[in-house]
């Protein structure tokens, strides 16, 4: 289901991406292994291979991008979780390669989609579901403001959300709404969320060559 890990030493290949790890002391896999071993953690190799070192019983950290992974102990696919939630991590790019990372994110999207069903167009119900899923209040306000305005209101079937996209599913068609970084006015690829693209485009060149399904799109700007 997921691509194989590149056998090239990630610390060396990070130079290709001009990335300086945030925790240089844990750049080697031996150092990351030791961080787990001294705390008596078993079967830790999958976490250290995914770039993480031990921080606490409830948290591990990526040595490169600094991503915090909570409630990690029973996760079966830490590498996939890492790539999905930290797509610009230099370690992940060096380990899987750009194309491999894109393919992994695409396959993992199906596994990690969250859904909010809109029942009776109830704002309170939807707000509570979004809050339970951990989304910020500004994001929830934006979702609700756009979900319940005419003419879309009567067509909404459900709302699907994940880390990079939120999609309103309508009875007649599908519209994907992509987040835009307002600080530097950069838009990212609708499919992978990694590569920056031009304002009048929706997909990067790599995703176009992979023949991803192209959805009819509308772009909204939101600062979370």
Curated annotation (Swiss-Prot):
Entry-linked InterPro entries: ASFV_p27_C, BIR_rpt
One Gene Ontology molecular-function label: zinc ion binding
Main location: host cell
Residues bound to Zn(2+): 62, 65, 82, 89
CDD domains xrefs: BIR
Name of a matching Pfam family: BIR
Induction summary: Expressed in the late phase of the viral replicative cycle.
Cellular component GO terms held in the UniProt record: host cell cytoplasm; virion component
Keywords assigned: Activation of host NF-kappa-B by virus, Host cytoplasm, Host-virus interaction, Inhibition of host caspases by virus, Late protein, Metal-binding, Modulation of host cell apoptosis by virus, Virion, Zinc, Zinc-finger
BIR repeats: 29-92
An individual GO BP term: symbiont-mediated suppression of host apoptosis
Highest taxon listed in the record's lineage: Viruses
Cellular compartments annotated: Host cytoplasm; Virion
ZnF (C4-type) residues: 189-207
Biological function: Prevent apoptosis of host cell by inhibiting caspase-3/CASP3 activation to promote the viral replication. Also induces the activation of host NF-kappaB.
Assembly description: Interacts with subunit p17 of host CASP3.
Sequence similarity: Belongs to the asfivirus IAP family.
Name the record gives this protein: Inhibitor of apoptosis protein
The species this protein was found in: African swine fever virus (strain Badajoz 1971 Vero-adapted) (Ba71V)
């Amino acid at each position: 289901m997921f691509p194989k890990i590149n056998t090239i030493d990630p610390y060396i290949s990070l130079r290709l991406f001009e990335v300086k790890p945030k925790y240089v002391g844990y750049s080697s896999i031996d150092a990351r292994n030791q961080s787990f071993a001294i705390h008596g953690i078993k079967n830790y190799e999958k976490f250290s291979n995914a770039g993480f070192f031990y921080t606490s019983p409830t948290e591990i950290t990526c040595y490169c991008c600094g991503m915090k992974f909570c409630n990690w102990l029973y996760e079966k696919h830490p590498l996939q979780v890492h790539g999905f939630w930290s797509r610009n991590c230099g370690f992940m790019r060096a380990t899987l390669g750009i194309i491999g990372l894109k393919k992994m994110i695409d396959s993992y999207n199906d596994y990690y989609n969250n859904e909010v069903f809109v029942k009776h167009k109830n704002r309170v119900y939807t707000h509570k579901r979004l809050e339970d899923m951990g989304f910020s209040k500004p994001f929830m306000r934006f979702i609700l403001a756009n979900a319940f305005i005419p003419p879309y209101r009567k067509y909404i079937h459900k709302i699907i959300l994940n880390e990079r996209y939120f999609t309103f599913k309508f009875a007649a068609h599908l519209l994907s709404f992509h987040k835009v970084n307002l600080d530097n006015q950069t838009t990212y690829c609708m499919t992978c969320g990694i590569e920056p693209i031009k304002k009048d485009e929706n997909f990067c060149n790599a995703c176009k060559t992979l023949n991803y399904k192209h959805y009819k799109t509308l772009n909204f700007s939101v600062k979370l």
